[in-house]
Amino acid sequence: MGIPPYHWWRTVFFLIPALTVYTIVCGAASILSSFFDRNGYFAHGCARAWSWLILKTTGVEVDVIGLDKLTPGTTYVFVANHSSHYDTPVVFTHLPFQVRIIAKQALAMFPVLGWHLKRGGHLFVDRKDPDRTGILKRWRALVSQGLSLIVYPEGTRTVDGHVARFKAGSFLLAIQAGLPIVPLSIVGNRAVMPKGRLRTEPAHVSLIVHDPIQPPVLVEPTVHDAKDLAERVHDIVAAPIEHALDVVHG
């Protein structure tokens, strides 16, 4: 028997209260652990538990394709499309790496979530005044600890499910840091909770891990170099998503 769809009442009276409890409990454990776990490893475990609970409670099933392309213990920059609030839970649950995200500064203001991100070693970027030198310094500090990064270079969730243009900033940082980039395609996640809709639906999602890309070795990389790399990665990420949209729309 299939899982019945979640109607608005189920979201409001069951899912939202459940997610609130998960966030408070896992967030509190994460924040407390940061006082004795400076690397944030336990905090990441809390984030993975939180993500797993969210997916299970919502009824999201995930197929992971291509995970064997990754080498355990390697530090990567994971680059993914962004169409739903559920993208991060999907990635956190199914990537067996210690990862940190580059998040917009506004998230730092959220109670519990913002505190967890700050104490857990995640990076914040002010879009209006990005301090790339400071970000690169903090990025390298994370890399020295063997931590990988997750980037959503569209900058925000897309409305129509298509993959928007990738901004070049994070790719310039990746070139400067010399880290391999792993394109990730999250297919079908928009059906769970698209931008602008509160109600959630169960869905079958695919997380496609593409071949790692080693950025060019450049003494002084330019924005043009970053844009070229961004376009290349964008096309890889977008291909299976656009194919899925074509199938849906006939």
PLM features: residue spans?
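Membrane-interfacial terminal anchoring regions of lipid-handling membrane enzymes
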Residues: 1-35, 41, 45, 68-71, ...
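A secondary-structure boundary/capping signal
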Residues: 66, 80-82, 103-104, 152-154, ...
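Structural motif corresponding to alpha-helix initiation and N-cap regions
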Residues: 64-67, 73, 110, 133-136
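Catalytic core of membrane glycerolipid acyltransferases/transacylases, capturing the structured
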Residues: 26-44, 48, 55-58, 72-129
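Short gly/ser/thr-rich secondary-structure transition/capping motifs
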Residues: 58-65, 132-133, 189-192
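Non-catalytic C-terminal accessory region of glycerolipid acyltransferases
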Residues: 2, 134-250
